């Protein structure tokens, strides 16, 4: 039978749309304003009450301000893309390949109405990294927290509080749909661990393919993923095959000033190494976690990860390349653009292209930085950890089905019957392919050992692992080796002594080394159904994910009638639509 997802492209209304660089960041109206956050003191937020040391998981400056946004999803064919190549099919947010920035302040309420004007596809929008404290039904994952928003005018208003601050992004969680363009940035203003003068806003880095995400999903079911056709910087770049087409992204610095730049990797396949010729970057935040500042010449940014950095405009007034490179012997991704780059332009310099290409940075080998020290500390017991069947997740690729499994099971959700609906109806009869792990105790550390196919006979791959609803701590990982070495490491009792529970790295996306292991833990303080998955689109599409069902009784007790009515109404609308198209079947994990 034809693919349901593939049906998106079978009857598009022809439209010849030209690409224009979107205006990403909309300034906030001067409502709630911090009264002590200045260029010389970014650590303060509200004098005497909230600053960089405030534990944002415990205390939030609720402002009463509602930031309202509207996102309208449409589709087009024969679309002229940012690098001058016409794409057969594309999906757009408010008419652009990159949606508007959702911009708020710490403690604001964010309300986003999503209207689905796609022709055949449902959709949901996930607010990546947003904790969704006690608002699990707003997490935007079809088959887990809700049913899809039906096409041809269906809508949903997502409402949640910005308990965290920093930088993130939103994207569709309907199959691999975000690879077709349903992506945008999130900026939540708050304190910072280092002073700066100018906030440059988000820099969205993304791989870019001329084929549709659907075509690539099918291709990767029996082949290694192809190189990306290009790499975009805030939705633009030149065409590597014809440099007269497209344009470089230009980031303007003011000489003598310190600038904050919010780097986001929204790719489906490519992990990036980022560097700037002649400049270092000072890291002040990773994902939504403020960290003690430190300086580096380059950053490894995995899919879904974010780094907020400061850049001092202390060099000669000129133009400089910002370069993206690929490490790990091709295991981190690759592109047909041999030199993906943007231009760092000093105000007052000419408009000519930089002349110094710089040198490739040291290879990060698809591994995260280890010197991320959270400003707000945590202490986690590690000495008593014992690996067991109820806390170990074994990731494997089936060589026969080409599906990914966790403990032998491939994720395959039912769009029309989300896990939350089972829980609300006091049923545990969800399908085994929902890959549900019950986490019932409150206010505990839940430890999870993730092992990446150490016994594989072929090559294992690194995976950017993302958890919804929580920041997790990274207590340890297998030794640092190149993915090309394919050295197997299995966690043993002797590894316990190497674990770090003294204010360890804390974030929501971390790289799982090939044939290695990773030990993470999260606090059970947020009831709901929370997806954990690889953020390589083809991997989660092929089943690499599971759901932690956390405190189900407390989750139900915390719901109100409006929450439940909205869930049931949306599922009713979706299930009225989906059977009417019964020749179009879900043919991947659904998320």
From Swiss-Prot:
- Cross-referenced PROSITE patterns, in alphabetical order? MULTICOPPER_OXIDASE1 (PS00079), MULTICOPPER_OXIDASE2 (PS00080)
**Which residues are reported to be glycosylated?**
121, 234, 242, 265, 323, 407, 425
Q: Which UniProt keywords apply?
A: Copper, Disulfide bond, Glycoprotein, Lignin degradation, Metal-binding, Oxidoreductase, Repeat, Secreted, Signal
MF annotations from Gene Ontology: copper ion binding; hydroquinone:oxygen oxidoreductase activity
Q: Where in the cell is it found?
A: Secreted
The region annotated as signal peptide is 1-20
Question: What protein name does the entry list?
Answer: Laccase
The protein's organism comes out as Cryphonectria parasitica (Chestnut blight fungus)
* Name of the encoding gene: LAC-1
């Amino acid at each position: 039978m034809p693919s349901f997802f593939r049906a998106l492209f079978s009857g598009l209304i022809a439209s010849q749309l030209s690409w224009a660089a979107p205006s990403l960041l909309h300034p906030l109206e001067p409502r709630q304003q911090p009264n002590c956050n200045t260029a010389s003191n970014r650590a303060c937020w509200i004098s005497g009450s909230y600053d960089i040391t405030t534990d944002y998981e415990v205390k939030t400056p609720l402002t009463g301000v509602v930031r309202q946004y509207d996102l309208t999803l449409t589709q087009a064919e024969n679309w002229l893309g940012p690098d001058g190549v016409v794409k057969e099919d594309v999906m757009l947010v408010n008419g652009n390949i990159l949606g508007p920035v959702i911009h708020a302040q710490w403690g604001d309420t964010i309300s986003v109405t999503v209207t689905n004007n796609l022709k055949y596809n449902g959709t949901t929008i996930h607010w990546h990294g947003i904790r969704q404290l006690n608002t699990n039904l707003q997490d935007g994952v079809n088959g887990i927290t809700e049913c899809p928003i039906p096409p041809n005018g269906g809508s949903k208003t997502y409402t949640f509080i910005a308990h965290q601050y920093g930088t993130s992004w939103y994207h569709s969680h309907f199959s691999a749909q975000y690879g077709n363009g349903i992506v945008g940035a999130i900026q939540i203003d708050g304190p910072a661990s280092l002073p700066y003068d100018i906030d440059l806003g988000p820099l969205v880095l993304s791989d870019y393919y001329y084929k549709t995400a659907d075509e690539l999903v099918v291709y990767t079911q029996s082949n290694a993923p192809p190189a990306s056709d290009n790499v975009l910087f805030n939705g633009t770049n030149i065409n590597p095959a014809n440099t007269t087409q497209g344009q470089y992204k230009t980031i303007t610095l003011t000489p003598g000033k310190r600038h904050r730049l919010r780097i986001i990797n929204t790719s489906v396949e490519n992990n990036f190494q980022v560097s700037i010729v002649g400049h270092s970057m000072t890291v002040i935040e990773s994902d939504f976690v403020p960290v003690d500042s430190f300086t580096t010449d380059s950053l490894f940014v995995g899919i879904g990860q974010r780094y907020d950095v400061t850049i001092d405009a202390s060099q000669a007034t000129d133009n400089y390349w910002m370069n993206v490179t690929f490490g790990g012997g091709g295991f981190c991704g690759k592109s047909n653009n041999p030199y993906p780059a943007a231009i760092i332009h000093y105000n007052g310099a000419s408009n000519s292209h930089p002349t110094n290409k710089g040198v490739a940075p040291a290879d990060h080998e698809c591994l995260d930085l280890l010197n991320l020290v959270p400003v707000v500390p945590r202490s986690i017991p590690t000495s008593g950890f014992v690996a067991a069947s109820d806390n170990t997740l074994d990731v494997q690729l089936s060589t026969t089905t080409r599906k990914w499994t966790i403990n032998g099971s491939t994720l395959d959700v039912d769009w029309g019957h989300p896990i939350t609906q089972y829980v609300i109806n006091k049923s545990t009869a969800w399908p085994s392919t929902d890959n549900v792990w019950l986490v019932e105790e409150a206010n505990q550390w839940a430890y999870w050992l993730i092992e990446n196919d150490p016994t594989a006979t072929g090559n294992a791959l690194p995976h950017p692992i993302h958890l919804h609803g929580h920041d997790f701590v990274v207590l340890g990982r297998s030794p640092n080796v190149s993915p090309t070495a394919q050295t197997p490491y299995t966690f043993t009792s002797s590894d316990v002594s190497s674990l770090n529970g003294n204010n360890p790295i804390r974030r929501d996306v971390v790289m799982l080394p090939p044939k290695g292991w990773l030990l993470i833990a999260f606090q059970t303080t947020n009831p709901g159904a929370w997806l954990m998955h690889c953020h390589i689109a083809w991997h989660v599409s092929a089943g690499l994910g599971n759901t932690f069902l956390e405190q189900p009784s407390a989750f139900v007790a915390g719901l109100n009638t409006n929450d439940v009515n909205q869930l049931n109404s949306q599922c009713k609308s979706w299930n009225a639509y989906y059977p009417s198209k019964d020749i179009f079947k879900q043919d991947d994990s659904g998320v």
